[in-house]
Design a protein with these regions (language model features):
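Conserved helicase motor core of SF1/SF2 NTP-dependent helicases
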Residues: 211-214, 220-227, 283-299, 303-572
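N-terminal pre-P-loop "Q-motif" helix
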Residues: 166-186, 201, 280, 430
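Pre-ATPase regulatory/linker segments immediately N-terminal to the P-loop/RecA-like helicase/translocase core
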Residues: 59-179, 240, 246, 253-259
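Accessory interdomain/linker segments of ATP-dependent helicases and helicase-like nucleic-acid enzymes
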Residues: 1-76, 411-413, 422, 433, ...
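Hydrophobic anchor at the beta1->P-loop junction of P-loop NTPases
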Residues: 190, 218
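Conserved helix-turn-beta segment of the N-terminal RecA-like "Helicase ATP-binding" lobe
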Residues: 224-255, 467-476
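Inter-Walker segment of RecA-like/P-loop motor cores
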Residues: 236-286, 484
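Walker A/P-loop NTP-binding motif
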Residues: 183-186, 199-214, 232-234
Length: 572
């Protein structure tokens, strides 16, 4: 693991230097930079937080909690900040080292700033964690024996735990998962395919732990995942004062729990009698949650977390529960291609050492949309719950555009609109126009724009689609329809999802086949919809044969999706 950490940090540093050597325009197009920021004001309660107006909205990869370097085209100076809050037309940035936004090159009227994704050397955190595994009591007594397959802890009574859940409103597989987690002597994994109520099971399990007086840690790779889990737990528990997040404040809309910079500053640090929940990223644990041993450590979205990162969390407790799905998005490693990076997922690695319970009842997709992911990724085990199985796309005003009506036929939940283009790279205008026209028809037919999402592999295609949407929809509707890459959509759902693949030129496909045909990304993209998924793709993607056995297998998965869909040749 040490070699992976060192190689990855070196690769990240080299990639950052390469990216920063490019002109601003190229950095923006790559999605790692936001240009056209104008300082507006400091936050009234905290002068280290300032609002910056966005010239064209946020079309980058940058999200709340990300580290950025704020600079100017005319100054060598820069400020290191964290994205504290993201709004429709502005970004709130918090200085990482505190202080006040008082630099004239930032605050002077008319000054335009640029925010780039920053490089932060996290290697010391990883190396300290790896060393602690060898030197601490938890490492020596729990982690090392478990990883070596020599853990001898006895399980609690599973049947007793299951019987205690008799009155729960969870389905049987959710009850199995919660009971297994509560009875696990050391570690248990819960696989949550799309829409199967993973967060619900997590919240009920944590609630029972807290009411039993346990101290619980919830951690994840992203702030958003931690916020979602804490929101669910606080709502289920009904005592938000027993739920906190530790770390530099990141804006959380409507959350009932509070954020504290350090654990010692919150009331729970002085409560030795009752159970409570702490949310924190793994990096925060070593510096802001010192000398706290949790009764249970819960890792959410574990499919995206690497094993070295998971160890930071595992060092804070003797029982570990991992919630995630190895068939959805995996870890992103600069030093490894996606297929190899996926194998470093803590969820995949630990599934060889601990039992896994797979949730199998979906509450999102109707029966027609459930078939392909169930057979392709989950061995036919995933089924639509009766309450959603028969659901169909319902348009209050009927289809307002006869040209796209076949694609919106409620009898066909999964549709492939087949294009004949052969020159698509990262932008394909015919697909962009078709996507915009479908959205326009849906909105005119009574569907809300916020119930529609368009998922793309390339940011330039997203920009082209937004351009066409602005010409067909009122401004507010165009903004509410999400057009983004699959990373933005994991964990979200919409009534209708449109997937625009864009690419079709043979040489381009040969270079990017490993990325375009990734099964995990495809799984996430097509399982966001409740009643309708429309795939816009050239027939070239169905017939192209990439080099390499692994990529050939991935391409076969994509073809199986198209074969499962109702095909419509593009004619609108």
């Amino acid at each position: 693991m040490r070699d992976l950490v060192q190689t990855e940090v070196q690769a990240q540093r080299a990639e950052f230097e390469r990216r920063m050597s490019k002109p601003t325009k190229e950095r923006v197009e790559g999605g790692w930079c936001l240009a056209g920021l104008h300082w507006r004001k400091c936050d009234a309660a905290d002068a280290s937080i300032a609002e910056f107006l966005l010239k064209d909205g946020n079309e980058s990869r940058l999200r709340e909690g990300d580290y950025v370097r704020l600079g100017s085209a005319y100054e060598e100076a820069f400020k290191q900040a964290t994205i504290y809050r993201e709004e429709e037309s502005s970004l709130w940035l918090k200085l990482r080292e505190g202080g006040v936004w008082d630099d004239l090159w930032i605050t002077s009227p008319g000054r335009e700033c640029v925010a780039d994704a920053d490089f932060v050397d996290l290697e010391p955190f990883y190396q300290r964690a790896l060393e602690a595994v060898k030197q601490t009591a938890i490492g020596q007594e729990c982690i090392l024996p478990f990883l070596d397959g020599n853990d001898t802890e006895d399980a609690a009574d599973f049947l007793a735990q299951h019987e205690a859940l008799a009155d729960s409103q969870m389905n049987e597989r959710q009850k199995d998962a919660v009971a297994e987690c509560l009875a696990a002597p050391r570690c248990h994994l819960v696989q949550g395919p799309p829409g199967t109520g993973k967060t619900r099971a997590l919240a009920e399990m944590v609630t029972r732990c807290v009411r039993a007086g346990e101290r619980v840690l919830i951690t994840s790779f992203t702030h958003r995942a931690i916020h979602n889990a804490l929101d669910a737990v606080a709502g289920f528990l009904g005592e938000p004062e027993r739920v906190v997040k530790i770390g530099a404040p990141i804006y959380a809309r409507g959350s009932a729990w509070k954020n504290y910079e350090k654990f010692r500053d919150c009331p729970l640090a002085r409560d030795d009698d009752d159970g409570w929940v702490v949310g924190a990223t793994p990096f925060v644990l070593a510096s802001r949650v010192k000398d706290v041993e949790f009764d249970r450590v819960i890792v959410d979205e574990a499919g995206q977390m690497t094993m070295p990162l998971a160890l930071m969390a595992m060092l804070t407790g003797r029982k570990w529960l991992f919630f995630g799905d190895g068939e959805q998005l995996g870890p992103v490693l600069t030093s490894l291609p996606p297929r190899e990076a996926r194998e470093w997922s803590c969820f995949r690695m630990l599934s060889r050492l601990a039992e896994t319970t797979r949730l199998n009842t979906g509450y999102r997709m109707n029966a027609g949309l459930t078939v392909w992911p169930s057979e392709t990724f989950y061995g036919g085990d995933l089924q639509a719950a009766p309450v959603v199985a028969g659901r169909r796309l319902s348009l209050p005003s009927g289809v307002a555009d006869e040209g796209v009506a076949p694609a919106l036929d409620a009898a066909h939940p999964l549709v492939w609109v087949a294009f004949d283009h052969r020159d698509g790279h990262v932008v394909q205008d015919d697909e962009a126009l078709a996507a915009a026209r479908i959205v326009q028809a849906l909105v005119r037919s009574g569907l809300r724009a916020e119930d529609i999402a368009i998922v793309v592999p390339w940011r330039k295609q997203a920009r082209r689609i937004r351009h066409h949407l602005r010409g067909r929809l009122p401004d507010d509707a165009a903004r509410l329809c999400v057009v983004d890459t699959v990373e933005r959509m994991q964990g979200q759902e919409r009534e209708v999802v449109i997937v625009s693949m864009a690419s079709s030129e043979s040489m381009f496909l040969a270079r990017h086949a490993e990325f375009l045909y990734q099964p995990n990304r495809l799984n996430v993209a097509v399982t966001r919809a409740r009643t309708k998924t429309i795939v816009l793709a050239s027939t070239m993607l169905a017939t192209f044969s990439p080099d390499g056995i692994d990529t050939l297998e991935d391409a076969a998965v994509f073809r199986s999706l198209l074969q499962s869909a109702t095909r419509l040749d593009h004619a609108f």
